[in-house]
């Protein structure tokens, strides 16, 4: 698989879980002999929701909730078959969304 590239995108709400998962992927890939670029932090997506506190009136009184989505990008250059096998077997938390291209 010379000259090829694997791109891994990670998404999670918890920044500690995504950083630990990225660290685990980088350690696994470097152990198998492939080159790694990253993890590159991508912009954090922030969704803010305003909810009326009262069930009936007082529309001016609102409560704000936010949800942050953290993203990381990892590129694996010149992956070996051993690298691909190790990536398939890696155990990551369920809270981290992994997209492999």
Swiss-Prot record:
Give the GO molecular function terms. structural constituent of ribosome; tRNA binding
GO terms under cellular component: ribonucleoprotein complex; ribosome
Protein keywords = Ribonucleoprotein, Ribosomal protein
Q: Give the GO terms filed under biological process for this record.
A: translation
The answer to whether UniProt assigns keyword Ribosomal protein to this entry is yes
Name the Pfam families for this protein: Ribosomal_S10 (PF00338)
Q: Which domain of life is it from?
A: Bacteria
**What is said about its interaction partners and assembly?**
Part of the 30S ribosomal subunit.
What function is annotated for this protein?
Involved in the binding of tRNA to the ribosomes.
**NCBIfam families, from UniProt?**
PRK00596.1, rpsJ_bact
The family classification in the record reads: Belongs to the universal ribosomal protein uS10 family.
The protein's name in its UniProt record: Small ribosomal subunit protein uS10
Source species of the chain: Corynebacterium glutamicum (strain ATCC 13032 / DSM 20300 / JCM 1318 / BCRC 11384 / CCUG 27702 / LMG 3730 / NBRC 12168 / NCIMB 10025 / NRRL B-2784 / 534)
């Amino acid at each position: 698989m010379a000259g090829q590239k694997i791109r891994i995108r990670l998404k999670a709400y918890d920044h500690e879980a995504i950083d630990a998962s990225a660290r685990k992927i980088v350690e696994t890939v470097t152990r198998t002999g492939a080159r790694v670029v990253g993890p590159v932090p991508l912009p954090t997506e922030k969704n803010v929701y305003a909810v009326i506190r009262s069930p009936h009136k007082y529309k001016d009184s609102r409560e704000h909730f936010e949800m942050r989505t953290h993203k990381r990008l990892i590129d694996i250059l010149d992956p070996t078959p051993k690298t691909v096998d190790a990536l398939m077997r890696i155990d990551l938390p369920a809270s981290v969304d992994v997209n492999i291209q």
